[in-house]
Amino acid sequence: MSLRFYNTLSQQVEEFTPLHDNVVRMYTCGPTVYNYVHIGNLRTFTFQDILRRWLRARGYQLDHVMNITDVEDKIIRNAKAANQTIQEYTAIYTKAFLEDIATLRLERPERIVLATEHIADMVSAVQKLEERGFTYVSDGSVYYRISNFPSYGKLSHNDFSGIRAGARVDVDEYDKADARDFVLWKAQKDGEPGWDSPIGKGRPGWHIECSAMAMKYLGETLDIHTGGVDLTFPHHENEIAQSEAITGKPFVRYWLHAEHLSIDAQKMSKSAGNFYTLRDLLGMGYAPEAIRYLLASVPYRKKLSFAFDGLKAAATSIDRLRNYKLRLKTDKFPDGANTALSERTRAAASAFDAALDDDLNTAEALASVFEYIRDTNTAMDAGGFPAGNVPAALEFLNRFDSVFDVLKPATRTDGLADTEVNALIAERTAAKKARNFTRSDEIRAELAAQGVILEDTKEGVRWKRS
């Protein structure tokens, strides 16, 4: 079955084929580093991670660029309030973002690029738009004349034909009711940063940043552009208007947008004050892999309602997966192989692949895994799961985890948590019972390396921290 994605541009599920052989050129709108990202933001980046991993599992090579917006209105305000330069201020939250994605096991794109390191590229893009008649100047700032781009609105599927010519908007974020000519280059104001350029001293608008950086690294036409659904308009609409006005070619072939994460039926956002950061949840004792599981478990085009019960359920699901893998590694199975079980494993793997091929349907993919675990646990309980079927079962579980990446407990910089120590001790006990002394010794050594000393007694295993 072919790989298919819902394309926001066409509003249809389409078969995916990259423009050039098996290399996928992909761009992701990264964070605006004016504060810590919240888990609603991280839902989008988790979707992008699942997408990356599945494209690679399907044999594609990736050339993936993510930007970091490190100059814009909120950053300037917040840096001034903190009495810091924008470089000092954004360095804090850029570092925090990179730490957060590492904690959630999100793969880094091949390139992460900062807006302030590409000012010359943005100036060049604005100049090309000037040459082609898509701009005008007002009060020293350069604006994009959207009336000169007849297909404006084709991504968000809004009709902007009635917009009053010459009406302008200076802020980077606005809704469709305020759609107007948008700023490409903002003339410097007192107390704000600015860069000298042939188009005047100033700074780039948000939208030109992504157009310039995407085309610099990925060319005139991208295979995939991802982001949150809230970026469809105006940001991605404006990216199309800018880029296609410069090149005369389609900017992006497949637009993929992740839906909102909501809390109490409201979109989670900093402006509403109804958000949690990853650090908030870790501080409450939730494991990063449980947070990752929750964010990945609902298909990206469906809204995800955040609840702490959902995090607890995610942790329970991960325990079930880990216990199953432990059973496969430590139980003593009868000799031989079962043809029906071999076919059941192949069917489960096929269902898993088909679900992710179908616009990354993570819910169906997870269902295929847990149905398989249920069926094979039943066979194991009855003594009807031969040793010859174990390798294929482990291979299927590993394929699942190559995408979802939740089975390995998180490494803690302050040592293992008590629950993690107890889980490893339970695994060691099961390994010893199965006479797998090699694994038993490995676990003892692993715990010792983490400062945990074991003592085997008649009453069971005791442990202490060194």
Model-derived segments and spans:
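N-terminal, positively charged nucleic-acid-binding surface of large information/translation enzymes
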Residues: 10-15, 19-105, 459-463
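Short, glycine/charge-rich beta-strand/loop segments that flank catalytic centers
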Residues: 68-73, 94-97, 107-122, 140-149
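The substrate-binding groove and active-site-proximal loops of carbohydrate-active enzymes
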Residues: 80-86, 110-116, 228
